[in-house]
């Protein structure tokens, strides 16, 4: 048996929930604790529940741990439609209400962080707390963009057309391109395994995956992060992979503190996906923070 096959056998079994007449994939591990909230782990763009397998394994002895594939990603359905933060916010909120059955600690990476923040701000009855890991989403007072480059605008408009978008999708889902992208956003290259590349590529082979890819890039921006923080009341933990080339974590961290001073944050030697790159550190910090909420 290969190392990949051995690792796969230690993952929580797939389960499915029907939402809006579509099949939504999730996993659950661990036992409910009366005095501890369940965890709900939410992946980033192009990822899935598979990206959390190290965290599920490390946290399931202390918590009931759920992870879900957002509609359009992973093993969840990929119907034609508009994909946006409001869709995933509704999905997460209704999943907590219907399947988990009590408020959860939402932990989200990148796009999943933004969707989780939307739930915590707009549906406080679903959120016992929020953990953000290199979360996506702009602030209202972000620096104004430079004068638009007409060539860049033309390229963007062309790429949003069906054929160029499809060709771009075919390119970015190649294993060699996935590996190259991971090499850009992971500091520890040993964490970039064949298994990880396969986990990211597999959903891109599903019918509808190319349309989801195009729809996400066409979707309008949702609520700004500061607007969401001003509505939120639950505890907040932020874990930054400080080596992330896609965001200035220190500057973004200062913005979060400006709008939500009562937070806990840690900066880790990792890239865009600290939960997968340094899972032991993330699991320890998350565990200690959640257990400390009731004290």
Question: Where do the protein language model's features map onto the residues?
Answer:
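Conserved HGGG/HGGXW glycine-rich cap/lid loop of the alpha/beta-hydrolase fold
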Residues: 22, 27-75
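Conserved acidic catalytic loop of the alpha/beta-hydrolase fold
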Residues: 87-104
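Conserved alpha/beta-hydrolase catalytic His-Asp/Glu region
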Residues: 24, 166-234
């Amino acid at each position: 048996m290969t190392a990949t096959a051995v690792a796969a056998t230690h993952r929580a079994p797939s389960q499915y929930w029907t939402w809006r007449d579509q099949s939504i994939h999730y996993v659950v591990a661990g036992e409910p604790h009366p005095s501890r909230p369940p965890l709900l782990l939410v992946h980033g763009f192009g990822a899935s529940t598979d990206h959390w397998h190290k965290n599920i394994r490390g946290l399931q002895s202390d918590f009931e741990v759920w992870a879900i594939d957002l509609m359009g990603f992973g093993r969840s359905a990929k119907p034609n439609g508009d994909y946006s933060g409001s869709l995933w916010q509704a999905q997460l909120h209704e999943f907590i209400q219907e399947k988990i059955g009590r408020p959860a600690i939402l932990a989200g990476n990148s796009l999943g962080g933004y969707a989780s923040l939307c739930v915590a701000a707009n549906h406080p009855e679903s959120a016992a707390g929020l953990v953000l890991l290199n979360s996506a989403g702009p602030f209202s007072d972000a620096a104004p963009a430079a004068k638009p480059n007409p060539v860049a605008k033309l390229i963007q408009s062309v790429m949003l057309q069906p054929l160029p978008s499809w060709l771009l999708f075919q390119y970015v889902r190649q294993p060699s391109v996935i590996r190259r992208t991971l090499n850009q956003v992971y500091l520890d290259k040993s964490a970039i395994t064949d298994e990880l590349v396969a986990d990211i590529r597999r959903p891109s082979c599903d019918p509808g995956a190319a349309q989801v890819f195009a729809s996400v890039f066409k979707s309008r921006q949702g609520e700004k992060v500061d607007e969401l923080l001003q509505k939120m009341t639950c505890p907040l933990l932020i874990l930054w992979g400080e080596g992330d080339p896609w965001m200035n974590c220190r500057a973004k961290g200062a913005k979060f503190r400006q709008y939500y001073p009562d937070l806990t944050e840690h900066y880790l030697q990792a890239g865009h996906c600290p939960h997968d790159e340094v899972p032991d550190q993330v699991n320890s910090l998350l565990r200690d923070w959640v257990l400390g909420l009731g004290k």
